[in-house]
Amino acid sequence: MPIIKFVNEDENIEYAKEQDLCSLLCYAFDSEKTEFQGHRLVGCKPFGFPQEYMTNPLAVHEFMEFNHKRQYKYQGPFAKHRVISFTQQECLYLGSLKSVAENIISFYADRGYVAAYAVHGNTKNHHIHVIVDMLSYQDLTLFHMSRGYESSNINAILNIR
């Protein structure tokens, strides 16, 4: 069974500055961690920008930062960070995690949040980083999903794979 880690809550990390969010995105999108058979396993939703923007951590950060400035939000927390880890037995093909990751960020994007993913395959246990903006781009309200609600929806997506 995949493990869902709620990084903010489990490790008491806030991503209190824009630079913290930018550093997180750059770490997650690192090509040495996300490259698989010539493809980068990263992305962002909901925007329909060209792929080179959606796979660039600095561009993704600019989308999120613009959203914060629209609401005059200059103090964090700025993002929710989730990590979904798989054992070697659970994940035989790294490329299959891309569609799982896209479905997970669609869950957040469909509810009005900019969300990004990065699949890391450079470790024994493959894992997906999910980074979600704290402000809704639709109505500028703060992130308000309970842990149970997120967990049950992510698990439902994982059970479909």
Kindly give the residue locations of the regions a language model identified.
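N-terminal nicking endonuclease/strand-transfer module with a His-rich metal-binding environment
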Residues: 1-161
